[in-house]
Amino acid sequence: MNNNKPLVAIIMATYNGADFIEEQIESILKQNNVNVHFYISDDDSTDGTLNIVKNFRQKYPENFKGLFNVLIKNPCKNFLNLVNKIDDSYDYYAFSDQDDIWFPDKLEHAIGIINQGHDLYCGRTEIVNSKLISFGYSPLFSFPPSFQNAIVQSIAGGNTMVFNKKIFTLLKNNSQVEVQSHDWWTYILATFTGHKVYYDQNPKVLYRQHNHNYNGSNIGFFNQIIRIFYALIGRYKSWTDKHFVELSKIVDLGTKQSLKTFYQYGILRNRLYLFKFSLNDIYRVGIYRQTTQGNLFLKLAIFLRRA
């Protein structure tokens, strides 16, 4: 191991990932100009995932530092539980899924961005099928990452996220939470506390879509219809409710602007009367999603008290 290279802790939660995890791990082991330590938490897989990981650990003992077999049955809690088992001795940290392919320069590129003054790196992905044939990209976002965006939208998957020790410590201190997803919560925490987030419009991950993905991509008409349905039945509202509960416990960590947004949006989404609402209320609070369509849906959800 080259001690002059940055040391990155890979935070990987697995469940029945035997079909693709070997390619995922190999793509991480082949990363340019970094050293990696794997921490893997397996949520009671039944398909041989653990055996594959153990074989890697036997072959590369210096790279595999933690392997845990748990019974949680929840990907978000599996990730956050694993965060609690890792120390803060690493230069950088990165979430990893079990079925993607990382570009060889993913970590090196992300670290370069972080070293320019950012705390959390995330980005777009290239969508591929089980045979790695490309068929699109995750949505392209152009508005800056901020808490005003994070409170209403997650802009990137955890499989793209790389972060410094400050974000890791913040996340570890706020990991015993009831939230929907580890990546959205990481984005919310980072922006709520005033840390700088960088969204990369150039993909560094092949995001594999197959029959067993926990979360699918956002592309395609059918997926958009599903998300509209979720909004109308109040699923997004329940997720945001959880975020508000957890943020209310750490208001002392929020910036002045974040707290203003937090309280004003809380008043707006919990108003007593359906029609007591105007577009000026949204502009005043400053919340926004990344696309025109997304902002239209946000306004509709707020109007219907489903935000």
Range-by-range predicted roles:
Residues 179, 185, 208-307:
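C-terminal subregions of glycosyltransferases and related glycan-biosynthesis enzymes
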Residues 1-219:
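Nucleotide-sugar donor-binding/catalytic module of glycosyltransferases
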